[in-house]
Amino acid sequence: MTEMNQTAIRRPFHRRRKTCPFSGTNAPKIDYKDIKLLQRYISERGKIVPSRITAISQKKQRELANAIKRARFLGLLPYVIK
């Protein structure tokens, strides 16, 4: 019983950091016309999901936010979801 407790103390669980889905070789391009891609990063209430939840890099998060705002302005995405 004590051996099991000691191994748990020595090796704590480390959560692996997620990588940005938009950086890499086969990464999708952020485009304001790609509604299916943009909808994955909008909450149920219509808000843009923060990068700490989606693990998107800061640069790509800004691009994504601008694409979502542009799509909203053009009427491709709703501002508020009821």
Swiss-Prot record:
Residues 1-25 are annotated as: Disordered. The keyword Ribonucleoprotein applies. Keywords: Ribonucleoprotein, Ribosomal protein, RNA-binding, rRNA-binding. One of its GO terms (molecular function) is structural constituent of ribosome. Binds as a heterodimer with protein bS6 to the central domain of the 16S rRNA, where it helps stabilize the platform of the 30S subunit. Part of the 30S ribosomal subunit. Forms a tight heterodimer with protein bS6. Belongs to the bacterial ribosomal protein bS18 family. HAMAP family: Ribosomal_bS18. This is Small ribosomal subunit protein bS18. The lineage of its organism: Bacteria, Pseudomonadati, Pseudomonadota, Alphaproteobacteria, Hyphomicrobiales. The gene is rpsR.
